[in-house]
């Protein structure tokens, strides 16, 4: 997302056009190019390429490919492999497919739905948008569904903090932010950095706010940025590299204030994001093994891998020519013996040290969308204790509406205790100063998703701590021998997004195909 945001903003500036226009044009160009490549690739697979891939380089035994992890990344990878004539076996520890792409159904009145995990899709997220189109799954435009005249509410220091006031405050740090962006360059990686980029990587977001914002982190703008980037990455801002703030906030235009730069969170899949998972799984059904967890990986002398799985009390080995690891590093580090995997020292450093954010989602349903009557679109940020909200039901039928209280870091970690009802009551007391009268419209329905307690992810999504851009960023997705890696945690541009899963799943599939056919 970040690299794409950088180039989009740069093109818009040079051409003196709106960012949305550039996004739309790129989507059309990308779709046309992808359609062309898809037709050529599938035609080749149907004639000369597929037999070569199935038979392997030498024309002998088929290449044995194993994909470990049946989340969105692993399923996308296996789906693209199958289209190219490579039938991988997919192993998943959970009994459910999809990982963090998982829709809530049946919990709310009027048939309304919510997402357990990944929810919003940017306009620039072309990989997942094109996959959804290929699977004939329409997307709903969340921004177009917002009632005219509604806007985001900020509430800090005991009072409303208006959008014009926030824009004025941002103007005060504009030159500093853009000078940092220019001098840092994008991206900053373990093998690519400038002096300023390396310097900022050694600072935290909190440090940079205190240095650049008048009044520091105790000012209204400072508090807003602290809350926004806490929930964005699921960690306290004093733990995160300052570059994570710069590479989003830096892509605003003069007089504009988008907290997350070019990220506009415009779409979601109509009827639930996990329909992508379902559609992929139908195509791959005979290849998927569930309830089977990876416990060890060993690189053999011939370059093959022996991977050890556990299914209940049974442990067994599988030998593969190619292994795609499509599960979070938090799981690899915690649950898998990699002492004989033969990975590079830098890869092992990333596996051990890449941080996993803590985010929780409290979805609360109301009998009507009272926030719209107040002039609010459902998006709020505040320092009253709940952190942030957005409306889950934009574009949904019915009079009821759902707000999600989205928390990160220390606050998110507290959601491992309490009931949905008690947490909803707490939230309503905290949000009442921002949306007065809301409490009276709660219909008694609420759900909690506590991602730090999820045994299959051990957190919400990845982020880089102070110093980690220059320490190992960029190695996460790099091929290591005959091992390939995918998942949002291996994406530079779309870390933390469903897009990151799809984009890297396709990348890993491309690597395998190139090697097998090479």
Predicted regions and their residues:
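Mobile amphipathic helical/loop "lid" adjacent to a hydrophobic cofactor/ligand pocket
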Residues: 2-13, 133-135, 140-248
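N-terminal secretory signal peptides
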Residues: 1-32
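N-terminal export signals
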Residues: 29, 34-57
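N-terminal glycine-rich phosphate/pyrophosphate-binding loop and immediately adjacent elements
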Residues: 61-186
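Active-site/ligand-binding neighborhood in enzyme catalytic cores
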Residues: 20, 189-296, 311, 319, ...
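Generic structural signal for small/hydrophobic residues in well-ordered secondary structure
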Residues: 72, 98, 132, 209, ...
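Conserved flavin/dinucleotide-binding core of flavoenzymes
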Residues: 84, 304, 310, 335, ...
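Central helical "cap/lid" subdomain
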Residues: 298-299, 310-373
